[in-house]
Amino acid sequence: MIAWLLISFFVLLFLGVPIAMSLGLSAMGGILFLGGGSTVTIAQRMFEGMNSFALLAIPLYTFAGFTMSKGGISKRLMDFCYSIVGHIYGGLAHVNVLSSMIFAGISGSAVADTAGVSGMFMPEMVRKGYSKNFTVAVTAISSTIGIIIPPSIPMVVIAGICGISTGKLVLGGIIPGVLCGLAQMIVSYFMAKKEGVPKEPGHFTIGPVLHGLWESWPALLMPIIIVGTITMGIVSPTEAGVIAVVYGLFAGGIIYRELKWEDIKFAFAETVRTSGRIFIVIGAAKLYTVMLTTAGFDKWVAKTMLGFSTNPTVILIVILLIFFIVTMFMESIATLTLFMPILYPIALGVGINPIVLSVLITVVIGVGLVTPPVGMCIYVACDLMDVTVGEVFPTLVPFIAATFVCIALMVAFPQLILLPTYLMA
């Protein structure tokens, strides 16, 4: 049974069959032809995987992100960020990163950030003398902050799969997200120096910052409301998603008056398309995981890993490597839904903190989103600038290396992840 499930899945994936179909067909083949259970199990298990209150946050934050991009909120956020860091060498790259950090507090999606805030900024960077490769690299890597700083769609998925408190989990992403953002800014500074990018005129003054703050306060209030209400325990991340949708419509349509009916229809259509793809993957992965568990695959993995080592740090590093490698070839939500039910109990068994584990996995998945051959963010950014992944990837390597340095710091000092949770407790 295990051999059938693994071989059939990877053959279908290699043939270009969509990930949800590959998972579903492999699992159904095991049920129908190998006596893996009743056919009623197919619908039951798929519905069980998707039937989660926490997962309702996915379409809500996706819709909020699209309304933000179309409602003038993104542009004002970027103008405000420019007034703060635009004077630094490589200023537009820093604006790109800082905008992504703020946008992360609204959308929870890396791809939405790439196509939205950062995507809007790329033509301006090229016009100001930044190479296309540098522009695409910093845009792609900065968008990964969108899944680290709360609210985070992958963390919501992890919480739903593993039964972890969503509020505590998303809080754990605050310091790691800021740390990764600062690391990206440092790399951007030295790469801008290396490329000889012209420095933006002027220097830091408080006047433009105050003006930018006045112009963008409704936009800045949005992530403060979302993260603040979650942090204080007033609402759950899913309920905060409803607030994000309502506030995004209000700010874009009433305050800024830039959100049109056509934009709302576009946001609805894209949300349905994006969320539908995610949920069908989650449902199919749930069915596939149940079949693997029934066949004893989880016990074999646990026996193999624990036979190698029982040291928590070693097991943690092995788990992170598994997620990094798999995310290079599979969509991130599918990776989480497939591997978390198998690897999470092993991590708990050796004493790894579930919040630390989940946040680190999220950061590693972010790296996978910009790593070929299936890194979705890098492909979206390359498509927007009409360059190839092969041309951009060498420029992206220093950013990936900086992210791994941040991961190493978090493994060595897990308090960086747990501090916000301790403070709120």
Where are these regions (language model features)?
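Alpha-helical transmembrane segments of multi-pass membrane transport proteins
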Residues: 1-425
